[in-house]
Amino acid sequence: MESEKVRDRSSRNRRKTFLLIGVAVLVVVAVLAVVFGVIAAAKNSANSSDSFKNVVINRCETYLKENMPGKNDCKKIWGAFEQAYIGRDPCDVPPEVYDPLISSVKQDVACNTMLFWSKTKTMVHAFTDNRDCMITLEDTLLGFLFDGLTWCSRNESKETFTTDCPSWSDCQNNPVRSFWIKASLNFASTACGNVSAMLNGSLEAPFSSTSVFGSVEVKNLDPDKVDGLTVLLVTKDTDTTTCNHSSFHNLQSILDTKIAYNCREVPYSTVEVCISDPEIPCSDCL
């Protein structure tokens, strides 16, 4: 009888021991999972930063090789860009922090070639990709480097993130929005001669005073350097919007009175033909 009690006690002790060992193993596994997760996250973050940097540097080197070798230093441009947002709250990156970046990029754009746009990005870039007569912000080195990219950092972080960043309208001073506002301001303020703007005739209101073109670029055209602004209103056969649309009265009220204003309706089909046939003179396209 006594020996049975001893055996039962011994069996219970073994079960307790196995249970404790099992719990200990689970705790160790959980701790290791957290540790490895943190390490993996840090590695992924570092990889993301390096990957983003490589994209920008490669774009820079490609652009300089094809357009203006020797005038700019890609690593210095990256450094000036990175210091603008690294370690900052992604909703506290005002446009002026990109001033050093703007100063680090050296490029002169010929007068009478600058083309602004609003809600016509695909068409305007299809056109300038096949033509040398007009140039948009995204065709300059500064715009080319960051077109289509997303980036941000975090408070006291040394990393660049390309996901979970604020979108354009999430907060006013986010890194991407502030960059494009500053770059657009710079592009407009350096414009000279006669400039053009391709707008979308399929929209109910082709000009918006809250767009980057309306709120930044038009307001920063220098009347001492810019002679005139021509709106190129791209229209399809079914569109009813014309150059007489009321939104253009708003545009003219914003535009400096010393800058001549003109508007021309351009058939969508004409632009398409000019995109597919680079032999057609630019003067016959726009």
Give residue ranges: language-model regions:
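Active-site or metal-binding loop neighborhoods of secreted/extracellular toxin and effector enzymes
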Residues: 31-40, 50, 58-68, 189-286
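Alpha-helical transmembrane segments in eukaryotic/viral proteins
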Residues: 18-47
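Intrinsically disordered cytoplasmic terminal tails of membrane proteins
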Residues: 1-15, 202-215
